[in-house]
Amino acid sequence: MSEIIIRKARREDCEAIRMFIQELADYEKMPDGPKIDYKTLERDGFDGQPLYLCNVATSDEKVIGYTLSYYTYSTWCGKSMYLEDIYVTPDFRRKHVGKKLLKAVAKEAIENDCHKLDFVVLKWNPAQEFYKMYRASDLTSKEQWHCYRFVEEDLKKLASDCE
């Protein structure tokens, strides 16, 4: 097997990353979920102040996986990081690529004074076992936190009532 290299994503990786976002959405049984294109990823990640951090895993210079994360802030502990996505193509799963990608995110978080790394995993997703191997806590069962969301339409309605 070729050497697996983890590196910062480049603008030219955005087409592959967008394709992987769709593959991840398909796996998560939400094929209509992703609404962005690779141009949005390019703009938001590489123009002006980047809105996200992204690493890619490569084999023979071909992108085979990625992570996408960003900084958050916790009133309990300060600077934090959120892991939005981690994805490895099926041919490279169970070859420690996910571990290398996750470790790169953890290193970035620690080097930038983050006190925690948050993420969500679907209830049925076997990836939970992967995260538990590295001592991730399931906050839903441990602390009874539930995740909520306002979708764009509801967010607009809520904002329209703002004085």
Annotate each predicted stretch with a short phrase.
Residues 56, 62-70:
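Conserved beta-strand in the GNAT
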Residues 5-17:
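A short beta-loop-alpha structural element at the N-terminal edge
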Residues 43-56:
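A short helix-loop-beta-strand connector motif used in the catalytic cores of GNAT acetyltransferases and
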Residues 100-116:
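Conserved acyl-CoA
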Residues 99, 111, 123-143:
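Conserved active-site alpha-helix within GNAT-family acetyltransferase domains
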Residues 18-44:
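Conserved GNAT-fold acetyl-CoA-binding loop/helix
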Residues 57, 94-102:
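Glycine-rich acyl-CoA binding loop
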Residues 86-93:
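A short, internal acetyl-CoA/4′-phosphopantetheine-binding micro-motif in the GNAT/acyltransferase core
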